[in-house]
Amino acid sequence: MAGFRKENDEVWLDVYIQPKASRDQIQGWHGEELKIAITAPPVDGQANAHLIKFLAKQFKVAKSQIVIHKGELGRHKTVRITSPQQLPAILDQSAD
């Protein structure tokens, strides 16, 4: 899947964010991007902070190991996760 890459001990994700959702969840693939719904509104960086917190739980890493490289102000983002301890099921299937 083009929106998911492993490079050494890093995982790179192209994500599409749906803010103000009813619950936090990975919804599946949205074209070449992983669609993630989060409950935070897209105001004053709240959605980005919430996305990092959500991804940290999914990958079992510290929040400091997740960096938004592109798209801080938009719904389309590129995220780097360093040394993930686990992969969410949808990505584990894509890695095969």
Swiss-Prot record:
**UniProt xrefs under Gene3D superfamilies:** YggU-like
Task: Output the lineage of the source organism.
Answer: Bacteria, Pseudomonadati, Pseudomonadota, Gammaproteobacteria, Aeromonadales
Q: Name the HAMAP family for this protein.
A: UPF0235
Q: Per its UniProt record, what NCBIfam families does this chain match?
A: DUF167 family protein, PRK05090.1
Family of this protein: Belongs to the UPF0235 family.
Pfam families xrefs: DUF167 (PF02594)
Give GO cellular component annotations, separated by semicolons.
cytoplasm
- In its UniProt entry, the species of origin is given as Tolumonas auensis (strain DSM 9187 / NBRC 110442 / TA 4)
The record's listing under SMART domains reads:
DUF167
Q: This protein is called what?
A: UPF0235 protein Tola_0962
